[in-house]
Amino acid sequence: MFRGVMESAKEFKKVVDTISTLLDEICFEVDEEGIKASAMDPSHVALVSLEIPRLAFEEYEADSHDIGIDLEAFKKVMNRAKAKDRLILELDEEKNKLNVIFENTGKRKFSLALLDISASSVKVPEIEYPNVIMIKGDAFKEALKDADLFSDYVILKADEDKFVIHAKGDLNENEAIFEKDSSAIISLEVKEEAKSAFNLDYLMDMVKGVSSGDIIKIYLGNDMPLKLEYSIAGVNLTFLLAPRIEG
């Protein structure tokens, strides 16, 4: 069995919105400890991983199941969530469906057919990064939007004094500079200077669910995948993005 109740359907909608921009489908690995999932995007450029501990739920009951979901259908359902709706997720093993229920003055129930997909063997690799930056999510998102004016990729740079997001087009360029003592920087731990380029569309998709007040943890090195971590309503999201190879 599986049944989980969350206080805010709208908050979980942000999670589904974010991962559905990168993935078409996903297999949720459910057990008594919570829910885990990881998958590569179809182009094998990005890895998406999420963890929902049982403490993120108001109520939670589960034994071990793999629940395959079409994320486009899940997104359409979650878009129907209202501001004060509670979210109930429950597995109907007899009908092989996941019931998505919004509870407020009444109950609205949607039943999603399960996909026959196995849990991904792809996991977030254990990589030791030389640099870790913690930055306010809204500041990072705004810098990416600025970069999007001129380029389809960004160069992320870090040294012991600052974190820089640089974009350069054919004629124009822009730069967002966050000094170590900037109000946007929570912490800047740099062991070696780093500079790497990344696809901007992927980065913007990865931070789609970030709201004002959220903190993003950025792991950066030279010629290493970029790693991003942040949480939405107790759901822990991790993304890896391959660096852009300069021609």
UniProtKB/Swiss-Prot annotation:
<keyword id="KW-0235">DNA replication</keyword>
<comment type="subunit">
    <text>Homotrimer. The subunits circularize to form a toroid; DNA passes through its center. Replication factor C (RFC) is required to load the toroid on the DNA.</text>
</comment>
<comment type="similarity">
    <text>Belongs to the PCNA family.</text>
</comment>
<dbReference type="Pfam" id="PF02747">
    <property type="entry name" value="PCNA_C"/>
</dbReference>
<dbReference type="GO" id="GO:0003677">
    <property type="term" value="F:DNA binding"/>
</dbReference>
<keyword id="KW-0238">DNA-binding</keyword>
<dbReference type="GO" id="GO:0006272">
    <property type="term" value="P:leading strand elongation"/>
</dbReference>
<protein>
    <recommendedName>
        <fullName>DNA polymerase sliding clamp</fullName>
    </recommendedName>
</protein>
<dbReference type="InterPro" id="IPR022649">
    <property type="entry name" value="Pr_cel_nuc_antig_C"/>
</dbReference>
<dbReference type="InterPro" id="IPR046938">
    <property type="entry name" value="DNA_clamp_sf"/>
</dbReference>
<comment type="function">
    <text>Sliding clamp subunit that acts as a moving platform for DNA processing. Responsible for tethering the catalytic subunit of DNA polymerase and other proteins to DNA during high-speed replication.</text>
</comment>
<dbReference type="GO" id="GO:0006275">
    <property type="term" value="P:regulation of DNA replication"/>
</dbReference>
<dbReference type="InterPro" id="IPR022648">
    <property type="entry name" value="Pr_cel_nuc_antig_N"/>
</dbReference>
<dbReference type="GO" id="GO:0030337">
    <property type="term" value="F:DNA polymerase processivity factor activity"/>
</dbReference>
<dbReference type="InterPro" id="IPR000730">
    <property type="entry name" value="Pr_cel_nuc_antig"/>
</dbReference>
<dbReference type="Pfam" id="PF00705">
    <property type="entry name" value="PCNA_N"/>
</dbReference>
<dbReference type="InterPro" id="IPR022659">
    <property type="entry name" value="Pr_cel_nuc_antig_CS"/>
</dbReference>
